[in-house]
């Protein structure tokens, strides 16, 4: 009887681990988005976010998915897909969850068509330039961001785009996923056709 009870307890323990909604296969990582729901995020702005085929997608409007919790030192890993002309990004340490911008957060940019290395894909706006500038459009990508104290590193598809950049303006805050409107064309019309998708977002406290 004792042996059966011990086996039963072990099986129950394994079942609990298997069904944990926050569990990740790697030690220390917590899933914020797994393609199924947006329980860990609030939407602000007018971007038309919706769940499609295991991803959260937007192709119109200007807005953010803002994490419900704030974080200080961590690694974040996100899988994303964008059109070549899409304007997106991952904002970290956002101090105002109702109004996200580069003036109150660190903006890790995803924008292939911006020629300025301060704003290119993989750059941290006003903190870390990217050179040479990678291209993320038309494919799935993995972006890893490390924020520890005043030091920031960005890795895109295994290649460092920002290496140990320094800035101390913001110590903690929310995480925000962006769908932004593009630039105006010669007729003054804003490009609003870029598709942005996120299918997995994980975080690990440091």
Segment roles from a protein language model:
Residues 3-7, 19:
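N-terminal export leaders
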Residues 9-11, 188-189:
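Detector for intrinsically disordered, low-structure N-terminal pre-sequences
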Residues 12-20:
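Hydrophobic h-region of N-terminal signal peptides that target proteins for export
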Residues 19-206:
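Carbohydrate-interacting regions of secretory-pathway proteins
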